[in-house]
Amino acid sequence: MKILFAAAEVAPFSKAGGLADVVGSLPKELEKDAEIAIFTPLHGCIDKDKYKIKEVENSEMWLTFGNQPHKFNLYMTKLPNTKINVFFIKNDWYFSCFKEVYPKYLDPRYEHERYISFSLAVMEYAKALNFRADVIHANDWHTAMIPLYLHSNYKFDEFWANTKCVFEIHNLAYQGIWFEDVLDFANMRKDIVYNQWGCEHYNRVNWMKGAINYSDRVVAVSPTYAREILTPEYGENMDYTLRGVQYKLRGILNGIDYDVFNPKKDKALAKNYDVKSFDKKEQNKKAVYDHFGLKYNPDRPLIALISRLVDQKGIDLIRDMQDELQNLNADFIFMGSGNNDYENLFIWLSNNTKNIRTYVGYDAKLANLVYAASDFFLMPSKFEPCGLSQLIAMRYGSLPIVIATGGLEDTVTGYPLDNSNGFKFWQYNGWDMLNAIKCALYVYTDKYVFNAMRKSAMESDFSWKRSAKQYLDMYREISNKK
């Protein structure tokens, strides 16, 4: 069986969010049962020398969009520690000129042009390489055009005649919505796709709606999120469409790469440890206190937050409760970037409080050290399709404090239940979050209970093995391949 993954970002080459981790790790678990190729843009931030990314010979290709020819080139390397080919599509006008995966302040129309061009280039390069995929696995709105192309422009193309499509929703809030004329730029058959059973949504083109309608299976990244998006509260005006295709909707929990996130071998840590030696974890806490200029006190727990600084992640709750957090017997490390107002708030807190320190930006090595150093990991998301941060935190023995939504509900067993590995609150407001934090601080004073919970968290299995089997069964079901 041949599986083609298409995504805007793939770890470790390019990463802005959890999508990169999923596409960079799930194929590893599938490799023994399928032949896999991954396609992603060659962003300007990708280090070609570091990852030994080389240009494919005679790969220059010209494609026309909006009556303008555009030049593409193909580069390739292997996914680390695998035999999986990762193909990078280079275009100087749309991707290679930017140092970020998702540059800020782009013209929205231009953003659509970027991923239309990428999606069509994926189709054409797969043909040029003779990679006749049994299943194309598209991810989020950036590659939502692929199911539409399969249904329209390539509908009678013999090369794609037996190809099925899986579309994965990592975050329903970002759907790719623009005016009807974007279909002309895409050279897409408007008479076929622009209707209520295709991509038309409130007199606009909605790429995600089209992908949901035309894909053979639609995957949400956790069972709870799959149920939530069928409701008006979480459905982002797409719940009606999703209820209509509920027969092909699946909820499969994401995992993390246990080789990448491994406190026993992680070189970013001051001291390595595992579930049998998590007393050594304290050395990482001391290192983080030194790094951020906090006064170390073993009786004060460290609470970390590593997140995009946007409303979805519950940063407004931290803003609302900032005075209360300063008065707790705990220290805080906040890391992230995003909304300018939240970035400025974090900088102010770092400069004007005794127990809160922040890092505005993202540093993967520092993030791993903070995971290892922290006693608790705060994740008060308004909604969370799956969430990987709480899985990483538990892997490193940091107990998550989460709101019971989406993948957080599926992965965290809240205190005081048996085998609890974290703490939950149920209402999205600052006082409920504060009460959950206070509960965690109370447990911290009882080292027997705290260490039992830490052991339970570190022994929780959120590797890709179980989820990969569900994906593989789904691929086989729609392709009739074994």
Where is each model-derived feature located?
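Catalytic cores of nucleotide-sugar-dependent glycosyltransferases that transfer UDP/GDP/TDP-activated
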Residues: M1-K482
